[in-house]
Structure formats: C-alpha cells, structure tokens
A protein has these predicted regions:
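Conserved N-terminal substructure of TIR/SEFIR domains
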Residues: 1-66, 70, 85-89, 122-137, ...
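Conserved beta-strand/loop subsegment of P-loop NTPase cores
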Residues: 91-95
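Long, low-complexity, compositionally biased polyampholytic IDRs enriched for Lys/Glu and Gln/Arg
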Residues: 139-187
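A short, gly/pro- and small-residue-rich
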Residues: 76-90
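Conserved nucleotide-binding/hydrolysis micro-motifs of P-loop NTPases
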Residues: 71, 97-102, 120
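Glycine-rich, charge-decorated loop segments at or immediately adjacent to ligand/cofactor-binding or catalytic sites
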Residues: 99-111
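Short acidic-hydrophobic, aromatic-tinged amphipathic segments that line or gate anion-handling sites
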Residues: 113-119
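Short, hinge-like loop/turn segments at secondary-structure boundaries
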Residues: 53-56, 108-112
C-alpha cells in the first residue's frame, strides 16, 4: 500500500453474475472505491493470468465476493476465497441470487453478508458504508504505522548523532592528552 492510501477491492464473481457484478462495481466506483475486476485488468492471452489474480488479491485491501448458486459451484470463486484467506483479506460477501443454502459457500456461513436480492439500493448502501469504514480503518492503521516508522527513524538518527558527538568528544580528549604529553616532554 502506498502511504496514506488504500489498495483496491478485489471483486470475485461467477461469469453468470456479470450483470450484478457490474452494478456493484459501478456503485463502489461512484463512492470513490477502486475495484479490481479480472475482465478489465487481464490482457487476453496472458499466459500467467492465474498469477495476476493472485497478485491482485495479495495487493487488495479487501475482497467482495458476489454470491449466487453459480458462484458457490465456481472453482475460481473458491480459489479466490482461499487466496483471500491465505493473504488474510477481509471478505465482504454479497448475496445477489438464490437462497442462503444454495448460494453461500460453507466457508462464509459465519460471516455477515449483504443481501441485494430484495432491496439492491439499500444493500449497496450497506456494502459501501461497510467498505468505506473498513478502508478508513486501514488508512488509519497505515498512517499510524508510517508515523511509528518515522519516529523510529528519528530516534535512530538522534542516537547516531549522540554516538558521533561522544566519539568526537573522545577524540578531542585523546588529542588534548597527547598535546599535554608532548608539552610535558618538551619541558
């Protein structure tokens, strides 16, 4: 993450949920949240596209997973969830189609999800608010981390300056002793 900014939000979805994914992405971008979507970022024919997806999840601040019966059956959605867990990313589940049992993967059953099935506008507002809060928290943590790094560097520089001053003082004392010895020998 660059200083004082948050990374993108990775969007995990089944191709059959592309329309719902596009509405979610449009809403998030309208709120100033950067969304990473594979069909926009991957160049067709890229031989290592799986690695590009992994890198995108690794660099993401969070993952939004679009839930539906098709998403639950998707090997790719499962792989992306696995990577999100592996990279310790906060996952925001969004239910767009189907009932809970047929749409929500067992790895997500204990997580609160956003339901877009009955009131999409209210659900999107809820998702946007939750993501904004979380991204603000990450930004605050990053600011605190950078401040701590700056303070540690300041303390390190102060210690180096103190050591240099002590060394210079010791050299002056040694030089004075030598000069005093030379004067004593001359007498």
């Amino acid at each position: 993450m660059s200083p004082l900014s948050t990374g993108h939000v990775f969007i995990s979805y089944s191709r059959r949920d592309t329309e719902a994914m596009l509405r979610i992405v449009s809403f998030l971008r309208g709120r100033g949240i950067t969304a990473w979507v594979d069909n926009e970022k991957l160049v067709p024919g890229t031989p290592i596209w799986e690695r590009e997806i992994e890198k995108a999840i690794d660099k993401a601040s969070a993952v939004v997973v679009v839930l539906s019966p098709d998403a639950k059956e998707s090997v790719w959605v499962l792989n992306e969830l696995t990577l999100a867990d592996e990279y310790k990313k906060r996952v925001f589940p969004v239910l767009v189609r189907g009932d809970f049992r047929e749409s929500v993967h067992f790895r997500l059953v204990t997580r609160q999800f956003v339901d877009l099935r009955t009131n999409e506008e209210r659900g999107l507002e809820s998702l946007g608010a939750a993501l904004s809060r979380y991204l603000d928290e990450l930004k605050q943590i990053e600011e605190e981390r950078l401040a701590a790094e700056r303070e540690a560097e300041r303390q390190k520089q102060a210690e180096l300056a103190r050591i240099a001053a002590l060394k210079a003082g010791e050299e002056r004392i040694a030089k004075s002793k030598l000069e005093a010895e030379q004067l004593a020998e001359e007498k």
